Amino acid sequence: MDMTKNHTTDTEEFDDGDIRPVSLGIVDDYNASFELPLKPKFLQSENFSDLTSEWDQSRSNTPGLAEGKTEKAQPCGTTDSSKNRIHVEQLLESANEMNNYLAQNIENINNFQVGLLNGGKGLYSSMGDDSSACINGTNFSSTSNFELSDDELEDTTGCTSSIFDKDLFHQQNGLSIPRRRSPLFKSPTASFEIGDATDVEEQDIDDSIFSECSSITSFDMGGLHISLPHDEEEDQEKTKSESENPLLHGIPVDVEVPHISVDEALANFKETIELLLKLSGNRKCTGFNTRVEKKEYSNFYMKSKPTLSSADFLKRIQDKCEYQPTVYLVATFLIDTLFLTRDGNNILQLKLNLQEKEVHRMIIAAVRLSTKLLEDFVHSHEYFSKVCGISKRLLTKLEVSLLICVCNTKLMVSNRKLAASKLLLNELRSFCV
């Protein structure tokens, strides 16, 4: 039987070189066919031209690559840098625009630089409600827009207070830092190294040194009289000395501080300031106390009244710092201590007249000092100065000035003082009716 009759192969040729279908037919029991995408032998080299082409050193290193299409190897990163490269004409045009801008605004730029060197003189910033950052749960925003007086900006190296520390110019940038020790209480401390010997006598320490140190009960520094606690007897004397404060008359020692919200504490603080302003405007209620340091108290005076009201200013401080109610209670008592006293008939009387141009700086100093008396963690010097819209140097000056003004009173916070702020407000209300 001839096998060529059973297996037949049909081929068709195409002039365009397309794939020629090859059909294999098996005609025994049925007719079945399938197609394979193959090319004839004379076109097979085009299936894998890169592999079948001969090597030619005169051509490209890549076999099968047409002449004129050779690619040169480029170092890594040259393609991206060439795409981002600025044209020379565009660069010259940008430089020309920058020179024109500097020529038109060179005077403003010089004034701005001089203002920075003078500690911020003449610089203004908008007090916006939008915050640009939120770190440690505290909003960070721009400063306020009221102008600082010229007195604290003329001298860039010193301060009106003799206890000003130059190290306060170098504050850290953190918004929440551990509580720092005040420079008011910075005193040189003796330091010595203990050797390997365990016997104390080998250190040659004279007991008289300790006896002299233990005999020191108080000292004066920068106009402040600072007493050092030693034992329980002195603690009892402190509680007795609180009764010497005329504002605490009639308040029991074991008084309980009533629960109060932040809004109520802020409202009491605002109302206390408003009543003090009202009393200061009354000719019958004139300040008579001359023991307050006039030089330090003058730091609270501003040349012009701020455009922001004291109520909005307090709201801004609370929004950015989120203080507890006790902070405003202590701040209220500090304001009362500075401006109020009692006469021989146990009636409230003004020691100083409060003016509108002193309110904002008085608020700054009272709130800042209150936080340091109560809290272990306070906002950084830089952050609080930006919240209040003043320089760091002025913030230090206001804080120290308030300390010196109330140096004759005990600063230790007690329940009596927390409760006194509310009771004194009630007396002021009845007194101003």
Curated annotation (Swiss-Prot):
Which segments show compositional bias classed as Basic and acidic residues? 1-10
For this protein, the record's InterPro entries field holds: Cyclin_PHO80-like
- Gene3D superfamilies according to UniProt: Cyclin-like
Instruction: Could you list this entry's UniProt keywords, alphabetically sorted.
Output: Carbohydrate metabolism, Cyclin, Cytoplasm, Glycogen metabolism
UniProt keyword annotation of Phosphoprotein present: no
* Disordered: annotated segments: 1-20, 51-81
The protein's GO terms of the molecular function aspect are: cyclin-dependent protein serine/threonine kinase regulator activity; protein kinase binding
Q: Which regions are flagged for Polar residues bias?
A: 51-63
Q: Which processes are annotated in GO (biological process)? A: glycogen metabolic process; negative regulation of glycogen biosynthetic process; regulation of glycogen biosynthetic process
GO CC annotation: cyclin-dependent protein kinase holoenzyme complex; cytoplasm; nucleus
Q: What is its main location?
A: cytoplasm
* Domain of life (superkingdom): Eukaryota
The listed locations are: Cytoplasm
What role is this protein assigned? Cyclin partner of the cyclin-dependent kinase (CDK) PHO85. Together with cyclin PCL8, negatively controls glycogen accumulation under favorable growth conditions. The PCL10-PHO85 cyclin-CDK holoenzyme has glycogen synthase kinase activity and phosphorylates and negatively regulates glycogen synthase GSY2. Also has minor GLC8 kinase activity.
Share any extra remarks.
Answer: Present with 217 molecules/cell in log phase SD medium.
This protein's assembly is summarised as: Forms a cyclin-CDK complex with PHO85. Interacts with GSY2, independent of the presence of PHO85.
Q: Which family does it belong to?
A: Belongs to the cyclin family. PHO80 subfamily.
Q: Please state what the protein is called.
A: PHO85 cyclin-10
Source taxonomy lineage?
A: Eukaryota, Fungi, Dikarya, Ascomycota, Saccharomycotina
